[in-house]
A protein has these predicted regions:
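OB-fold and OB-like single-stranded nucleic-acid-recognition modules
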Residues: 1-122
């Protein structure tokens, strides 16, 4: 749990869809583990893959931590958890025409689900 003001959570929708602003949302984590992206200047950047449900469809989104605090929180995420976040979103299209979504996460909250509790033996 973050020690910062989490008044942004009031904007979270209860049906799993995007909130009042594209920077606030909720994603589920189907697979645990941090992946690393390589930036254009050669640095490695940690990221977590989540599933964003919106308008009856599911989209994969990469969650990229804004700072070390958020990065540490992401390392504790288990398969089946739900992440509520606030951040800056963006999308890009690759050469094949596929659209990729990413969010630079400024603050987040991890909601443990029954599946993640059972995986950890709790």
């Amino acid at each position: 749990m973050s020690a910062t003001n989490q008044s942004w959570r009031m904007l979270l929708p209860h049906d799993g869809m995007i909130g009042m602003s594209p920077q606030v949302g909720r994603v589920s984590v189907p697979m645990a583990g941090i992946t690393h992206l390589r930036t254009s200047d050669g640095r490695r950047c940690p990221a977590l893959r989540g599933v964003w449900s919106e308008a009856g469809r599911s989209l994969y989104v990469l969650l990229v931590p804004y700072d070390v605090r958020v990065s540490r929180m992401m390392q504790d995420v288990n398969r089946g958890d739900v992440i509520e976040f606030v951040g800056m979103s963006g999308e890009r299209r690759d050469a094949g025409g596929d659209t990729h979504y990413a969010v630079v996460v400024h603050d987040m909250n991890v909601v443990r689900t029954n599946a993640s509790r059972m995986e950890n033996g709790n």
